[in-house]
Amino acid sequence: MSNESSKKQSSKKALFDPVSFSKDLLAGGVAAAVSKTAVAPIERVKLLLQVQASSKQISPEARYKGMLDCLVRIPREQGFLSYWRGNLANVIRYFPTQALNFAFKDKYKELFMSGVNKEKQFWRWFLANLASGGAAGATSLCVVYPLDFARTRLGVDIGKGPEQRQFTGLGDCIMKIAKSDGLIGLYQGFGVSVQGIIVYRASYFGAYDTVKGLLPKPKETPFLVSFIIAQIVTTCSGILSYPFDTVRRRMMMQSGESDRQYKGTIDCFLKIYRHEGVPAFFRGAFSNILRGTGGALVLVLYDKIKEFLNIDVGGSSSGD
């Protein structure tokens, strides 16, 4: 009895090891910050294409015709550095988001995967991978949503100078919305975000870990193979969850506005479908696929940084 109780206590300590948890935060956060900065211009193009129909700054005749049109007009109309508008907020938001996703993903995995044999219980093992990814994404979203909201609003602010800008920065955006709409204004679109993030993270983490777990030697997987797997996973996950992302960002655009275009999430889905058609749900999706390269780099860099920090990569990536 004493041996069993000591084993349970030691397993609990291992489950909440602060050193391992901190290393997870560092590895995921650094990888995320680097990749997001690299693809920031594409990120902004994607946001503008998604929400321009709901933006009061962009008149119908001035809307972007597509990704290339947007890429050309941004520096011409707003200046070259505006490609990175909202990037600082994105890095600040993305560091804890991705770090918490990865850190909690491994902790949730230890909870879900306990006693599961990959060889004998493959589908249970696969579902556990999906559940750990979805739970990690939903948990982190609850914490950082106001930063995600502010990043979106800053990224789609198309004014050229301070006098034409809706917000002057991250702090100004949060304060203005909180003052006009209260805390709930910073969580506009939160419900559909949770739905989308669970779909995205479940496939993003679950599929990546599952595919890597099927490889003969997960720890010795070549960089190129890991990158290709990650690229396919991020692309498929992004397309699958993209309509949810479009709706949530349209909902975000309503905070601080007296005249609201949508009554709620369902109304937003219906109005986009009726007035703009199915393609509207996927505006900016190609930009999102290109942006997904950054997400693929995050997954691969995360494993490499964990190796550098002497964290057991096999336990987190293979699902063993």
Swiss-Prot record:
Gene name tied to this protein: Slc25a31
Signal peptide (from-to): none
Organism: Mus musculus
Gene3D superfamilies: Mitochondrial carrier domain
Location in the cell: Mitochondrion inner membrane; Membrane; Cell projection, Cilium, Flagellum membrane
Protein name: ADP/ATP translocase 4
Described function: ADP:ATP antiporter that mediates import of ADP into the mitochondrial matrix for ATP synthesis, and export of ATP out to fuel the cell. Cycles between the cytoplasmic-open state (c-state) and the matrix-open state (m-state): operates by the alternating access mechanism with a single substrate-binding site intermittently exposed to either the cytosolic (c-state) or matrix (m-state) side of the inner mitochondrial membrane. Specifically required during spermatogenesis, probably to mediate ADP:ATP exchange in spermatocytes.
Positions on the Mitochondrial intermembrane side per record topology: 1-20, 113-122, 213-223, 303-320
Keywords associated with the record: Antiport, Cell membrane, Cell projection, Cilium, Differentiation, Flagellum, Membrane, Mitochondrion, Mitochondrion inner membrane, Repeat, Spermatogenesis, Transmembrane, Transmembrane helix, Transport
Listed GO biological process terms: cell differentiation; male meiosis I; mitochondrial ADP transmembrane transport; mitochondrial ATP transmembrane transport; regulation of mitochondrial membrane permeability; spermatogenesis
